[in-house]
Amino acid sequence: MAVTDRFARRATLSRSLRLLSEFRYEQPDPARFYGALAADTATLVSDLWLAARGESVAGRTLLDVGGGPGYFASAFAAAGVGYIGVEPDPNEMHAAGPAHAGGPGSFVRASGMALPFADDSVDICLSSNVAEHVPRPWQLGAEMLRVTRPGGLAVLSYTVWLGPFGGHEMGLSHYLGGARAAARYARRHGHPAKNNYGSSLFAVSAAEGLRWAEGTGTLIAAFPRYHPRWAWWMTSVPMLREFLVSNLVLVLSPR
């Protein structure tokens, strides 16, 4: 069984449309948006683990790099996973307020590019929509592989710059260029975007991610995170994937 076989059966058009409908709530109602994304991500990781290892993910330890305020912790706890979140920004760690205070999992304030964990210390290392927010995404990826046990899974998912969501709250203006889009947003809103090009948002391509992952010798799957299964072929087509694979998932298994 291929590592993606189980999840591929869930990757339907209705799922894609349901998740797409939640994106408009990312800023006005983050609990709704991230709650839906967290549940879907926990299912994704559970399916990948079961297909790869032939056993339930329950009882395993997962390190979430860039875990934010803990929305994902609840979803993984419900799956029986031991959750550890890593987040460098104290504002992000407390963004959910009292709703997640004292919730499941444990949290560490640290950078994903220098994880304070021993080699081979977790079963699964996840990074969801973080790589495009750091200046050295493949250093983050290397750290994820370092802390993942042989036979475990490192799952790195990120927003592709030239896809329709690459500009985040700047909208499609990122097609004019990142710096120009950032300046335009600041003029219109009177303040920089939260995801500000050049400081908290960077242009990361699908080709870069695939090249890095293949170079590690540990890549076992790559597919568009939010697309239905019948559209996964786009990942294999240069240039097309940059515009139509809005979010790329890289699944790696250290040996």
UniProtKB/Swiss-Prot annotation:
Q: Give the keywords, sorted.
A: Methyltransferase, Transferase
Please name every pair of cysteines joined by a disulfide bond in this record: none
EC id: 2.1.1.-
Biological processes annotated in GO? methylation
Enumerate the InterPro entries for this protein.
Methyltransf_11 (IPR013216), SAM-dependent_MTases_sf (IPR029063)
Transmembrane region(s): none
Pfam families xref list: Methyltransf_11
Q: Name one GO molecular function term.
A: S-adenosylmethionine-dependent methyltransferase activity
Keyword hit for Methyltransferase? yes
Q: Which family does it belong to?
A: Belongs to the methyltransferase superfamily.
Q: What is this protein called?
A: Uncharacterized methyltransferase MMAR_0473
Species whose genome carries this gene: Mycobacterium marinum (strain ATCC BAA-535 / M)
Q: What is the lineage of its organism?
A: Bacteria, Bacillati, Actinomycetota, Actinomycetes, Mycobacteriales
